[in-house]
UniProtKB/Swiss-Prot annotation:
Gene (UniProt): pgi
Organism (species): Oenococcus oeni (strain ATCC BAA-331 / PSU-1)
Keyword Isomerase: yes
Keyword Secreted appears in the UniProt entry: no
Family, similarity comment: Belongs to the GPI family.
Single GO molecular function: carbohydrate derivative binding
Annotated EC: 5.3.1.9
Pathway(s) this gene product operates in, as recorded in its UniProt entry: Carbohydrate biosynthesis; gluconeogenesis; Carbohydrate degradation; glycolysis; D-glyceraldehyde 3-phosphate and glycerone phosphate from D-glucose: step 2/4
Localization, UniProt: Cytoplasm
CDD domains from the UniProt entry: SIS_PGI_1, SIS_PGI_2
Top-rank lineage group of the source organism: Bacteria
Major localisation: cytoplasm
NCBIfam families: PRK14097.1
Name of the molecule in the record: Glucose-6-phosphate isomerase
Length: 438
């Protein structure tokens, strides 16, 4: 049960000899990562996180998740970037885009994410959705001063204190923040919020398997131990002393790098299930922040087919050949629905009568990959055995390891994100924050 890398649609674009040529460098890069001797090594604790995590904190996460499930109809998760994308990705990938609509039937709280933008309307909508129901808050921020989540926390902190009073509200607010410093840590201490740690040696985009992601994920009814087990299996596979071309994450990094050097500057990750959407949003942050620097890097985009075949599909087929696709497929059917019968055959669908929808979807996948590769668009195929916690944990670590290797192959530090700070500084100047002037 691991990610399978398939090169069926790559033979016209990458020769085996090209892969062999990069093999020694990729092996050196993998060893550099494991030895933690490369640039940015102070931010590589994600490498061993699936096996070396705080077991006491993990137990508290489970306990708090049970409390929230028992006393709240809604959990409001406040965070931006890596402080929310991982959790939302896991929840929607495993539960569906309609997890909140289905939550009450499953006896689970609805989970809403705020602080992801400066939209007042979005906050209004979430407050309307909560209504008079019981709710809790998980505020996730290393510093507590990032503008968008800080505004959201002010808003929902006031709301929850007005509803329950400060003492009871303090039992419903859970802070995931820096262990030693920061505005949010101070607020949490002053108010007696239960605290979880944003790890020092793990960047936000690599943090989904820490308390940053695990508390909201557990509240949504997902087995976080199985998620960690899947990631641990991927960790062990990545570190195992064997031919590195047997490692799917390294193969993925090598092929991406070769395609990039050939002028394919854009990677579109593609799925055929709508519930993949936010996993792809997490993937985009992981790839863009890790690789997009020093005027280098593959630009990551995403698409959900067949939907987007009827919009950007035209460009992929007939437009400028600047992109390659990475397809994510689940081999086991995730639904037993079949094409239904009808009183007549005016829609001419009887030729697929009673065929599983999975078979129709797979036909679309194969047909599209054939069409795009024939038009000069390389396609990488990644397969998971099943849509479950173990396989997703494995996939998360797969992507993290792959982009780390890919970044080093491209000669950049895949663990910093200096460009993100520039808009923040400009925004502070525009809004007149003390200490920020032209």
């Amino acid at each position: 049960m691991k990610v399978t890398f398939k090169k069926d649609y790559l033979k016209d674009f990458v020769a085996d000899s090209e892969v062999e040529l990069l093999k020694p460098t990729a092996g050196f890069v993998r060893d550099t990562l494991l030895a933690r001797t490369g640039v940015g090594n102070e931010m590589e604790d994600w490498l061993t996180l699936p096996s070396d995590y705080d077991k006491e904190e993990f137990a508290r996460i489970l306990k708090v998740a049970d409390k929230i499930k028992s006393d709240s109809k809604v959990l409001v998760v406040i965070g931006i970037g890596g402080s929310y994308l991982g959790a939302r990705a896991v929840i929607e990938f495993l539960k569906s885009e309609f997890h909140n609509e289905k939550a009450n039937k499953e006896g689970l709280p609805e989970v809403y994410f705020v602080g992801t933008s400066a939209s007042g309307r979005y906050i209004d909508d979430v407050i309307d959705l909560i209504g008079n129901r019981d709710f809790s808050i998980n505020i996730i921020s290393k510093s507590g001063t990032t503008t968008e989540p800080a505004i959201a926390f002010r808003t929902f902190k006031s709301l929850i204190e007005k509803k329950y009073g400060k003492e009871e509200a303090s039992k419903r607010i859970f802070a995931t923040t820096d262990a030693h410093k920061g505005a949010l840590l101070n607020v949490a201490k002053e108010n007696g919020y239960e605290r979880f740690v944003v790890p020092d040696g793990i960047g936000g985009r690599y943090s989904v398997l820490s308390a940053v992601g695990l508390l909201p994920i557990a509240v949504a009814g997902i087995n976080i131990q199985k998620l960690m087990d899947g990631a641990k299996a991927a960790q062990e596979e990545f570190a195992k002393d064997e031919d590195i071309l047997n490692k799917p994450s390294i193969l993925y990094a090598i092929y991406r790098n070769i395609l990039y050097r050939k002028g394919f500057d854009v990677e579109t990750i593609v799925g055929y299930e709508p519930q993949f959407r936010f996993l792809f949003e997490w993937w985009k942050q992981l790839m863009a922040e890790s690789e997009g620097k020093d005027n280098k890097g593959i630009y990551p985009t995403s698409a959900i087919f067949s939907t987007d075949l009827h919009s950007i599909g035209q460009y992929i087929q007939d437009g400028k050949k600047i992109l390659f696709e990475t397809i994510l497929d689940i081999t086991k059917p995730i639904s037993d629905r079949v094409v239904p019968s009808a009183d007549d055959n005016t829609d001419n669908l009887d030729y697929i009568l009673n065929k599983p929808m999975k078979e129709v979807n797979e036909a679309a996948l194969t047909a599209t990959a054939q069409a795009h590769t024939s038009a000069g668009v390389p396609n990488i195929l990644l397969q998971l055995d099943d849509l479950d916690e173990f396989n997703l944990g494995n996939l998360i670590y797969f992507f993290e390891a792959a982009v780390a290797v890919s970044g080093y192959l491209d000669g950049i530090n895949p663990f910093d994100q200096p460009g993100v700070e520039i808009y923040k500084t400009n925004m502070f100047k525009i809004l007149g924050k003390p200490g920020y002037t032209d």
